Amino acid sequence: MVQMIGRMGGTLGAPFECFRGVYDIDWFQQDISHPVPNDDVDLQLVWLRAIELEGAKIDSHVLAEYWNTYICATLSEYGTGKNNFNMGIEPPLCGRMRNPNKDSNGAWIRSEIWACACAGNPQLAATYAYFDSSVDHADEGVYAAVFCAVIESAAFFEKDIRKLIEIGKSYIPEDCKIVC
């Protein structure tokens, strides 16, 4: 239920993404008679397609190629990563170079796909979350994605929240801001 409400909020809030302010809204701002693009959900669907077609061959380069082929998002870190890749800058550098949003939240909010694809295998979830996040993020943006993918993957079998947090922390640098 919470996830569904979050997705609805993401869809209905999309016209205001990247804009700060208080809005006086009394109706939907877009046509909702059919599904509207949502870059975060769209990326997860593209990753599922990559898993289906590429299997274990998935790495950052493969994901960047799929991103470039299927995703139109040009905002923020998404656009920077894509533009860098189009200029021949390979992951993980395409997520780092000229990217003022490299530490942003775009990668961790889509990391659940790797947790579900690698249910109960946090190490594999961490690997794929790294491959994914390094296309458009670096540093804290990557650590957050890995941390979330790991704890969500482990949560399929571990229910103790404190243990899950410790498991997640074991996959990222001790001195990163996610841990501190």
Regions found by a protein language model. Give the residues of each.
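Structured, active/binding-site neighborhoods that engage oxygen-rich ligands
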Residues: M1-C180
